[in-house]
Amino acid sequence: MEKLFNENEGMPSNQGKIDNEEQPPHEGKPEVACILEDKKLENEGNTENTGKRVEEPLKDKEKPESAGKAKGEGKSERKGKSEMQGGSKTEGKPERGGRAEGEGEPDSEREPESEGEPESETRAAGKRPAEDDIPRKAKRKTNKGLAQYLKQYKEAIHDMNFSNEDMIREFDNMARVEDKRRKSKQKLGAFLWMQRNLQDPFYPRGPREFRGGCRAPRRDTEDIPYV
């Protein structure tokens, strides 16, 4: 009896061991298994989310770079096209403007510029020497100044302590200066008179070609112009 009891007792103990061995450690605790599975799922979700987050900023970085490159290329192309078009327009405009200006001014407006100076002034400017550019009033003043200077010098000689010989020399020099001045006047007058005769072939002359003659000028057949 004791042996059978022992055998019966041994059986349940062995069965309990077998049950314990066959059952996994988490089967006895379903709550623990659920918690572990949830943690695993959370970890997997976290890893996926982190991967997505890493990929998203990379994509965001790539997008602006690609967009910036595309914009820069588009702008450069537009600028190049605009410069080419602007250069062609600027080259085309001056020619048209020049033609319009040349065509817009009629011949009647161009001619007055050339005709603005009369022929008489051009001829006179070509024939006048350089000295005649000075006005006549200025020339008269210079002549008067020389005469006044000579008079003042004559009066001052008496006050100076010159000897008789020096006084004679000074008076001779002044006489020479006056003679030169008179001769220069006569030469200029004769030169002007000759110029008048050359300019006017029918200039009135006296009986012996003296100025201011009493007789009227004679006209021979040679003097009459051919009609």
UniProtKB/Swiss-Prot annotation:
GO CC annotations, alphabetized: nucleus
Keywords, alphabetical: Nucleus, Transcription, Transcription regulation
Function: May be involved in transcriptional regulation.
InterPro entries, per database record: TF_A-like/BEX
Chain positions covered by the region annotation Disordered: 1-145, 202-227
Compartmental location: Nucleus
Pfam families listed in its UniProt record: BEX (PF04538)
TM region positions: none
Sequence similarity: Belongs to the TFS-II family. TFA subfamily.
Species assigned in the record: Homo sapiens
Basic and acidic residues compositional bias, start-end: 18-43, 50-82, 90-113, 120-136, 206-227
Major localization listed first in the record, in broad terms: nucleus
Name of encoding gene: TCEAL2
Name of the protein in question: Transcription elongation factor A protein-like 2
